[in-house]
From Swiss-Prot:
This is Large ribosomal subunit protein bL21. It comes from Caldanaerobacter subterraneus subsp. tengcongensis (strain DSM 15242 / JCM 11007 / NBRC 100824 / MB4) (Thermoanaerobacter tengcongensis). Keywords: Ribonucleoprotein, Ribosomal protein, RNA-binding, rRNA-binding. One of its GO terms (biological process) is translation. GO terms for cellular component: cytoplasm; ribonucleoprotein complex; ribosome. The gene is rplU. InterPro entries: bL21-like, bL21-like_sf, Ribosomal_bL21, Ribosomal_bL21_CS.
């Protein structure tokens, strides 16, 4: 059984027990959250249900494992012959979650 969920403006295909990094969620570590923006779900018997745009009766529960920052990305811009150089770094925050249950 798998589900396609939406969180942080992105879509993820998840199964029970999956661990994935999503955009930062404002929940403390260890809390169980409900992801209710479910776009599609596939059952063991092969049936697939799609939402318009979301399924009302399907809920995915996940546990927040940790918060962190991704790898550093360096942005460098310059103008030739003008001695203008700017360097900036960015680390995207993320939340690591584990899918516990997909229930209808």
């Amino acid at each position: 059984m798998y589900a396609i969920i939406e969180t942080g403006g992105k879509q993820y295909m998840v199964r029970e027990g999956d661990v994935l990094k999503v955009e930062k969620l404002n929940y403390p570590e260890g809390e169980v959250i409900a992801l209710d923006k479910v776009l599609a779900v596939s059952f063991e018997d092969g049936n697939v249900e799609f939402g318009k745009p979301y399924l009302e009766n399907v809920k995915v529960t996940a546990k927040v494992l940790e918060h962190g920052k991704g790898p550093k990305i360096r942005v460098f811009k310059y103008k030739p012959k003008k001695n203008y150089r700017r360097r900036q770094g960015h680390r995207q925050p993320y939340t690591k979650i584990q899918i516990e249950k997909i229930e209808k």
